[in-house]
Every structure is written in structure tokens, then in C-alpha cells.
């Protein structure tokens, strides 16, 4: 599917010292060339594949007001982007890990949905070989490692103002999280908690199995069914839909999974994004601490792996060959 760019603008922040980020602002929007289209298509693809947090604008959000004004035609896109870059610089300059970069604002359409993407892209050095086979240095935008990115689903924001998921941004960074200062720049509050939704789903599945009085084998089959559906949705870039998931599971006492989860008050949305790490708990047990790391398939519990909660002891029958080899060699002093 093609990505159609409406407007795009680039600016730069140059780090002069620990407290100063200098601005270099474009006087004209960027022309939409094939190279620009390829860049945005790649940025959209990379961003879509990453784990994101959801937010909503607060009533005091200056950025939200500026976007509304721009959308109404009260301010042109370039002027909006220049002002917003200044606010972003002021916010980033408060933190010791602030770095310069190319600031990108792009309004585009993808699959009949309008988006506004804001990103700060770092620059990397590389080597270039020309037609004469001479080598020279070159620079490129480090799109694949971009971690300061936010995207507004303009269509959802304007048509469903009560939504809790029209604003997304990337999570996590060494030190203070990117999400923290980007939330300050966006003047946004936490929106849909994807991990909480997925944890709620796992709890609902376990309770559903308990209510049906399923044995361990049947319980694991249900968990595998749920995991398979959620994995397919994740790979397709689609949300988990309770009505679809419910259709894959056998009813309990003539009650569907969707009806069960609604009556039990798990507060699950009708649709929500899949969280890979949380959903892995459907088919795996994993944990680490005190120098020990364990990870095994859930169906092995009670078959080859046994846990005694009274003594907090885990017994493993049949160790992996590579581990057994290491233990044997260490015991024999080799």
C-alpha cells in the first residue's frame, strides 16, 4: 500500500554544549521527491514494528492547540513545525542526555488514515565507494534506531475525541525514558495501557479455564489457541478483537469468552494491541534472579518440570544436552 505525503518539513538541532541546542530552521517545506517518499515509507514501517505507548492530549497541550490551528488553516504547516521545533528544543535541553538531530514533521495518509509524525533522527557516518572506486565518507539518517518518535492518528483524534489511543510514542531509553520528556513536549497523559490490557486477557483466560473445570492438558490447549490467534494478529499488525478471539474458543456453560470476560469485569477493550512479551506467558514460563535464568514451555510443568511451593523447589527431569555436557565437563574438571 502506498503512503501519500501531504506536507513534510525538516529542521535541525545542533548540540553546542551540555546546556545549549542550537536550531537550524528551514524556510521552505521539503519537496516530496521519490527519495522523500522512500524515507517516509521506511520510517513508517520501522515505527509501526516497534513497541509503543499510548497517550492523550491534556487540555493544556500547546502542541494539540497548534495542530488544531494548523488543520483549520489558521497557520501553515511550515510555521507550525518551526514553532514546535523550538518547544521541543526547550524541553530536550532540560535533560543531560539531550542530543541534537534532524527534526522531522510529516503529515501523510496511509490506508485512508491521516497521520502526523514527529521524529528526531540521529545521523550516522559511513563509507561510500564511487564509480571510480574511490572511498569517501558520507552521512545518513539513522531511521532504524530512531527512539524519539511520536505519531498522531489525526483521523481518530478528530472523529473520536474520547479515544485513548490516537497518540503513540516510543518507549524506553538509558537513563530517563524518552517517553517521559516526550510526554512533556506533547503535554500528554497516559492513554490505553497495552500491557495492562494483555495482562487482563491472560487473567481472563485462566479464570475461563478454571470456570470450565479444565484439566492441565485442556487448559494448555486453550492457552495455545489464544496465543496462536494473538500471534497472528501481531504479525499482521492488527489488534486483538475479543469477538474474534471468542469465536475460536468453545463456550463454557453456553457462555462465550467475550460474555464471560465482560461479566467478570476485566475492563478489556473490545479491541487492543497485542503485547508480545506479555502474551509469551501463555506458552512459556520465564524468570531470572540471583544468578539464575529459567525459560521453559508451559506444557512441561507437571510432566518433566515440577514445582513444590512449600519448599519453593523446582525439579527438572532430563536436562538439555548442551547444559548436561557443560555440567559433566565441569564435574570431571575438564
UniProtKB/Swiss-Prot annotation:
Keywords: Cytoplasm. InterPro entries: Nucleoid_associated_NdpA. Its main location: cytoplasm. One of its GO terms (cellular component) is cytoplasm. GO terms for molecular function: double-stranded DNA binding; single-stranded RNA binding. It comes from the Bacteria. It is found in: Cytoplasm, Nucleoid. Pfam families: NA37. The keyword Cytoplasm applies. HAMAP family: NdpA. Belongs to the YejK family. This is Nucleoid-associated protein SG1574. It comes from Sodalis glossinidius (strain morsitans).
Amino acid at each position: 500500500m502506498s503512503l501519500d505525503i501531504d506536507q513534510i518539513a525538516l529542521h535541525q538541532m545542533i548540540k553546542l554544549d551540555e546546556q545549549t541546542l542550537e536550531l537550524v530552521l528551514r524556510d521552505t517545506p521539503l519537496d516530496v521527491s521519490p527519495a522523500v517518499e522512500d524515507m517516509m515509507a521506511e520510517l513508517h514501517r520501522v515505527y509501526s514494528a516497534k513497541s509503543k505507548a499510548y497517550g492523550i492530549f491534556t487540555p493544556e497541550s500547546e502542541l494539540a492547540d497548534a495542530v488544531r490551528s494548523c488543520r483549520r488553516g489558521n497557520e501553515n504547516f511550515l510555521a507550525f513545525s518551526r514553532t514546535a521545533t523550538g518547544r521541543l528544543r526547550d524541553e530536550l535541553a532540560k535533560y543531560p542526555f539531550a542530543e541534537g538531530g534532524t527534526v522531522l514533521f510529516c503529515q501523510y495518509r496511509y490506508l485512508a488514515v491521516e497521520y502526523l509524525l514527529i521524529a528526531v533522527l540521529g545521523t550516522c557516518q559511513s563509507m561510500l565507494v564511487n564509480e571510480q572506486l574511490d572511498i569517501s565518507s558520507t552521512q545518513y539518517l539513522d531511521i532504524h534506531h530512531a527512539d524519539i518518535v511520536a505519531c498522531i492518528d489525526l483521523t481518530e483524534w478528530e472523529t473520536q475525541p474520547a479515544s485513548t489511543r490516537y497518540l503513540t510514542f516510543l518507549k524506553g531509553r538509558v537513563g530517563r525514558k524518552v517517553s517521559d520528556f516526550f510526554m512533556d513536549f506533547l503535554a500528554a497523559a497516559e492513554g490505553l495501557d497495552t500491557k495492562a490490557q494483555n495482562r487482563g486477557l491472560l487473567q481472563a483466560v485462566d479464570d475461563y479455564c478454571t470456570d470450565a473445570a479444565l484439566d492441565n492438558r485442556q487448559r494448555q490447549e486453550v492457552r495455545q489457541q489464544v496465543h496462536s490467534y494473538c500471534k497472528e494478529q501481531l504479525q499482521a499488525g492488527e489488534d486483538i478483537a475479543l469477538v474474534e478471539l471468542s469465536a475460536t474458543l468453545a463456550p463454557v456453560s453456553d457462555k462465550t469468552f467475550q460474555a464471560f470476560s465482560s461479566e467478570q469485569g476485566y475492563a478489556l477493550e473490545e479491541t487492543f494491541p497485542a503485547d508480545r512479551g506479555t502474551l509469551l506467558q501463555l506458552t512459556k514460563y520465564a524468570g531470572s534472579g540471583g544468578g539464575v535464568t529459567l525459560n521453559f514451555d508451559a506444557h512441561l510443568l507437571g510432566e518433566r518440570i515440577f514445582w513444590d511451593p512449600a519448599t519453593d523447589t523446582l525439579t527438572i527431569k532430563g536436562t538439555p544436552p548442551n547444559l548436561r555436557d557443560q555440567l559433566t565437563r565441569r564435574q570431571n574438571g575438564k
